[in-house]
Amino acid sequence: MIGKVFRIHMVGIGGTGMCGIAEVLLNLGFEVRGSDMNDSPSVRRLRRLGADIFIGHGAENVTDAQVLVKSTAVSMDNPEVQAAQEKGIPIIPRAEMLAELMRLRKGIAIAGTHGKTTTTSLTAAIFDEAGTDPTVIIGGRLNAYGSNARLGEGEFLLAEADESDGSFLCLSPVVNVVTNVDLDHVDFYHDQQAIDTAFINFMNKVPFYGMNVVCGDDAGVRRLLPQIKRPVLTYGFGPDNQLRAETVTCGETSRFRVLLHGEDLGEVNLVQPGRHNVLNALAAIGVGLETGIAADVCLRGLANFRGVGRRFERKGERGGVLVVDDYGHHPAEIAATLATARTCYPGRRLVVAFQPHRFSRTKALFGDFCKAFDNVDKLLLTEIYPASEAPIPGVSGQSLAQGIRQVSNTDVDYFQDFDAMRAALPETLRPGDLFLTLGAGSIWTVGQFYLDGE
């Protein structure tokens, strides 16, 4: 790529997986253009950095680009993709561009069905504390950077590895992390065996001198371990793990001791609440230790971690109602987030606004979604965020609400759109409530609307 390609066009440039890559490319001196359907904060940030970005997709947006990079959500019948085909411009997925950036550094790829963004961010905090000056590309806004990415001068590139379309197999890291393996992205994988095969291939791609840092507590990971032919470091709470957390205390923050092969490395104080974040922190420590960072430096890095956007993010308080936002959109993520909410704020009534994400996911995991909200006092449910998918007959937010009522005692109200949900907030919320907005789409705007007093 270096010396041959200078002009890059990115379709879906404002997406969580794309904007970080775009920022690094801009900082490397490439000419970056692109398009997105929405004028988001990410788009505005990239424009300030020098990117030329169109709102809306059109063939006329593709002019003299030397390569077109498309996000996972962009289909091959997109007008800009078709224009690139007609012009003979190479078309690549975002993971292939990420692989090119990683090829120039020592790559560390954080994968798994859940927890990738937080784990990558925690790992970045450790590498920053160690003074390694890493390049970092993640799927959320890291508070320490104020963005999804940074270009460093050091030898390491830390990246969130997206398994959703199998393109994480383009990457060639020296250290992998696998946080968990659950059924998801059924629009691509169709069944558990397909996603298992992808993760097996991913873990076996590390070189013989590399390492897979994997969660030994996760049933999906344990199922795959006999087929992994490369080095493995397991982490978790269980006694069989090589890297373990003990004496765990979780409230609004987390505290635990870390043991490696039985040796006590010290105590971690983490601003992130929840046992799932203890596991994420263990993964980050494992990466740090495997790359030669001292244990005390790893622990200091975690203590200084300032959090990441949309991961149990405390947004503010109004009228005695505390508003928290989280990206969780898979039943397993929802369960972890709700457990954390109960642990952090045991005295508050828990009101959840949930926006399902993708028709295919809602259909495939319908039964799990119906049982996921047993732990809430009030559920506000809206329509499915399509994420470029076509509707599936019989699959909707309303059908999910009906399913929840049939299998649980959850008090659920369905709203066709955000306007209707916002209008119901004054009668729904009361002083002392915890109002949790939950989902990978735009549900966070409902919480912000309430805080703004509109």
UniProtKB/Swiss-Prot annotation:
Job description of the protein: Cell wall formation.
The protein's name: UDP-N-acetylmuramate--L-alanine ligase
Keyword Cytoplasm: yes
Main location: cytoplasm
Organism: Oleidesulfovibrio alaskensis (strain ATCC BAA-1058 / DSM 17464 / G20)
Subcellular location: Cytoplasm
Reactions performed catalytically: UDP-N-acetyl-alpha-D-muramate + L-alanine + ATP = UDP-N-acetyl-alpha-D-muramoyl-L-alanine + ADP + phosphate + H(+)
Superkingdom: Bacteria
PANTHER family found in the cross-reference section: UDP-N-ACETYLMURAMATE--L-ALANINE LIGASE (PTHR43445:SF3), UDP-N-ACETYLMURAMATE--L-ALANINE LIGASE-RELATED (PTHR43445)
A cellular component term, taken from the record's GO annotations: cytoplasm
Entry-linked Pfam families: Mur_ligase (PF01225), Mur_ligase_C (PF02875), Mur_ligase_M (PF08245)
Residues that bind ATP: 112-118
Record keyword Nucleus present: no
Entry similarity comment: Belongs to the MurCDEF family.
